[in-house]
A protein has these predicted regions:
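Conserved glycosyltransferase catalytic-site signature
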Residues: 6, 37, 91-94
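Short, hinge-like loop/turn segments at secondary-structure boundaries
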Residues: 50-54, 82-83, 124-128
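Short, well-structured N-terminal submotif of metal-dependent ribonuclease cores
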Residues: 1-35, 44-57
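Active-site neighborhoods of divalent-metal-dependent phosphate/nucleic-acid chemistry enzymes
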Residues: 63-110
């Protein structure tokens, strides 16, 4: 499974004709894409009032990853490891990464923070 980050969705939604859009369509067609709940919320909050219902229906077809108590414990441990390495990450990225780790999924993002997270062994990246 591939957890698709907000950065990929935004690029795809803004520029329908792109290599990211083609790759995302292929992942969706193969049922290989999943949606971390923070990504879903970011996408819905960024959509216009008119586009939001259609986007919500489209996103509802995807498996959505929700945090558990274990997710929060994993993030708490990562904060210590990252801090010890002189790294800091946003809450949303940590949550997306932890949800991917727990499900054995790869993360596809255009955000360099996930590359840094990968360097610490927190996530494995999908590279199309």
């Amino acid at each position: 499974m591939i957890v698709v980050d907000t950065s990929v969705w935004v690029r795809t939604l803004r520029a329908g004709a792109s290599k990211e859009a083609d790759t995302l369509r292929a992942l969706l067609d193969a049922d290989e894409a999943s949606l971390a709940v923070p990504v879903r919320i970011e996408l819905l909050t960024g959509a216009s009032r008119l586009d939001r219902p259609r986007l919500r229906r489209s996103l509802s077809a995807l498996p959505i990853l929700y945090p558990s108590d274990d997710t929060w414990r994993l993030i708490d441990g990562w904060v210590d490891v990252a801090g010890g390495a002189g790294q800091r990450f946003g809450f949303g990225d940590l949550l997306i990464g932890a949800l991917a780790r727990e499900t054995g999924s790869l993360v596809w993002s255009l955000d360099a923070d996930f590359e840094r997270m990968s360097g610490l062994g927190f996530v494995d990246l999908y590279e199309p």
